[in-house]
Amino acid sequence: MAGFMNRMPSFLIEDQLRSGTISVIVGVDEVGYGAIAGPVVAAAVYLPERECDYIKDIKDSKALSSKKREELFCKITAHAKYGVGFARVREIEQHNILVASHISMKRALQNLGVKADLVLVDGSRAPAGLPWAVKTIVKGDSISTSIAAASIIAKVTRDRFMRRLHEQYPEYAWNQNCGYGTKAHMQSLKLYGKTAQHRSTFAPVKQLSSECEGAPPEQLELLSSTGIKTPVDGRGDAVATRD
């Protein structure tokens, strides 16, 4: 794992796949898959400008400090084309986390605003039924700069969202744990019970008998605070995109 975390991604795989019919190559990644609270968030990113100084600093979001992620987020969103998609807790409960993560990826791509020739997806499984050519890449956020950029956009967007949720549910310290099952988070679950933002079908939450259902927040209002454009699609789902 350490080897992947320290690896600097590049455009090597993009260049290998580029051809006469493939020029617009988009990276896709998600974050929040293993959390026990909050949505799963995906981002799709197309980097048309490779010579910008910030490009060399892009790497897997997990290998970056929060400060560095925020810095790169601002630079990527200023120069790249991107889309963000959310799959909410009720969708995770209705389907499962894998399906929900694929839903978020589809929404990110649908709101990218760019016609992709090829989509690079982090992981071993891609959403079914995409109208674009797709290639999955295991540990793609450590290999492809396009996927690494998507990991940064998804991570910062979700972290900002969870910090705003923290204002409504301060007992769970989501501003620190971002909805993941830390020891402190689990202790708060035992003490206060679960909220509407907890994933009830996930074992750590399901095992707790006490419940404290709260009204779900207005997602569009929260998303607007992240600094990303947030139109609402035909299903009423909040999405994000950059022109």
Curated annotation (Swiss-Prot):
Q: Which reaction does it catalyse?
A: Endonucleolytic cleavage to 5'-phosphomonoester
Cofactor field: Mn(2+); Mg(2+)
Taxonomic superkingdom: Bacteria
GO terms, biological process: DNA replication, removal of RNA primer; mismatch repair
* Cellular compartments annotated: Cytoplasm
Quote the biased-composition stretches of kind Basic and acidic residues, using this chain's numbering: 232-243
Q: Which Pfam families match?
A: RNase_HII (PF01351)
User: Which E.C. number(s) belong to this protein?
Assistant: 3.1.26.4
- GO CC terms on record? cytoplasm; ribonuclease H2 complex
Q: Where is this region: Disordered?
A: 223-243
Q: Which family does it belong to?
A: Belongs to the RNase HII family.
Q: Which PANTHER family match?
A: RIBONUCLEASE H2 SUBUNIT A, RIBONUCLEASE HII
Q: Which NCBIfam families match?
A: PRK00015.1-3
Q: What does this protein do?
A: Endonuclease that specifically degrades the RNA of RNA-DNA hybrids.
The name this protein goes by in its record? Ribonuclease HII
Q: Which organism is it from?
A: Anaplasma marginale (strain St. Maries)
